[in-house]
Amino acid sequence: MCIRDRSCCNVREVANPRGPGNAVLIEIASSGVSELFVGLGAPQIRAEQVARNVLKKAKAYIGMENVPVGLHLADQIMLPMGLAAAQGETSSFVSMPLTQHSLTHKTILELFLDVAIDIEENGPATKVTIRPRA
């Protein structure tokens, strides 16, 4: 893991920036998935705090064993999997606990597509199965 190895880090100053804030991006890539954690600066928030917040989220993801899908990727992959389920294919993934956004996305997909989305919570891991509605 590269968390303490500065050779895998890149700090870039932008000449003529178009905004007043900073951005922190942490990408964690593995053989099957790539997760990107983003923090954007805001007025009255120190750059160090922005970085700490993003690092906290990245460390939480790294600390989850056998959970390839992060918090904000879950809702994004539900749409193509939902479309596949509407065509008769069943698929699943394991994620961190779903966000409210993902749960809302689940409800919308079930309303507009003829699919069922099952959620099985197993400790900190959540298995999501998207299948054709029976």
Which role does the model predict for each range below?
Residues 7-70:
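A glycine- and small/hydrophobic-rich beta-loop-beta segment
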Residues 21-23, 74-78, 114, 125:
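Active-site lining segments that contact anionic ligands and/or coordinate catalytic metals
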Residues 50-55, 71-87, 107-112:
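Proline/glycine-anchored alpha-helix kink/cap motifs
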Residues 90-134:
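C-terminal functional modules
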